[in-house]
Amino acid sequence: IQQLYHRNEGGFYLLAESLVTDVILAALSTGGDFAEIFMEDTRGTNIRMLNGSVEEGVSGRDYGVGIRIFQGFRSVYAYTNDTNRENLLKVALEAAAALSGAPQLTNIVLQRLVVDRFNPVRLEPQDVPHSDKVGIMKRANLAAAGYDKQITQVAITYLDTDQHVLIANSEGLLVQDRRIRTRLGINAVASKGNEKQSAFRGPGRHMGFELFEHIDVEEIAKDAARSAMTMVNADYAPSGKYPVIIDNEFGGVIFHEACGHGLEATSVAKGASVFSGKLGQQVASSLVTAVDDGTIPNAWGSQNIDDEGTKTRRNVLIENGILKGYMIDKLNGRRMEMEPTGSSRRQSYKFAPTSRMTNTFICAGQSTKEEIISNTEYALFAKHMGGGSVNPATGEFNFAVAEGYIVRNGKIEKPVRGGTLIGQGSQILQKIDMVASNLASGQGMCGSRSGSIPTDVGQPTIRVSEITVGGRKGAN
């Protein structure tokens, strides 16, 4: 491991430039027209606490190289965690053997790309004692557990990762990046007889241990406890078709899942998305502008470059209801005859990259949350969203409402639980009739064909004129 880093002109690199060049040329030896190396060296810590006791603490390191080759629209991918010269050349040649043809390149001149740094880090987690990390977890546990006697279980997780990457390709790109992320997870369980309800909060940022100077650990833990306790004492949500107000922050998970994946070139290029071929068409209410922006400083889903080495950027997906763009990676960009948008991501070197979201959100509108509620005769107010499922080809979704309330005559009447939102993403976009100005985001992990990656989801409070709500009670 000590030999991973090599001093090249301009500093230390994960691989020597001469080796990078030789591996790329080997990968192209059978007619490939593009080859890429992705190397990473990642360290991380994961600590789990249950009811104030540390159950597990793991620190580890993972490193390896992924080699990808294109020939037209074909793609071959291979990876290894043996980074010595002989093995890397062997893996490159084995991957190349899947293709046939004469070499198209015999020489590559690598040009170092200097990237803008959107995500400064002040306190590297590796330099912070484990006792300090556990101390943060204990504070969260005490705040949640002490909120009320109905809180019967509190689970806390702490996570930090420090990923170094090197990306080089046959177009001459050579770039390195470092991504440090820190996150706290709080899950509170409230009990009432045989009934149990849980609530989760998971603040995280693309930053170091200074995260805990930016968030109020105790207040977040208390909010999780409050939500769980409110829901265990709540009545069941009524079923039917009626307006739904979806609150800001993690409410954006519906757009992310039901619409965002359909705007990734992975599905668009195959015609497997309801948004395929609709650039320039109205796909949402004129109140809706939606963006994917990987450049927001220190946001959970931000990166200086994507996992193909393209600089991240602000991608406007929908503007005033009109479809303006997609999230595009290199391979699907070829298929669509469109340029990459800095949207290609992967969990690790073990995955070939593809188009994925970074920080995706519906932009702020002109109303206030209070105006939306006061102007609504009857609705379900979804304050926090839970898990769900989506068919990416159709945008059909099914999402649990983790914390809900009935709005009646312009006022929040009572809490309700067990509600489920059922619909089709593109139809819901058309039915958004009020958008507040209180844009906020929540953090999550998004799973897809290139693995699990950190993403921000966000929106202001919005009102949808009608959604099918699944519940245990008849309509009120």
Task: Label each PLM-derived region with a short phrase.
Residues I1-N476:
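N-terminal small-residue-enriched
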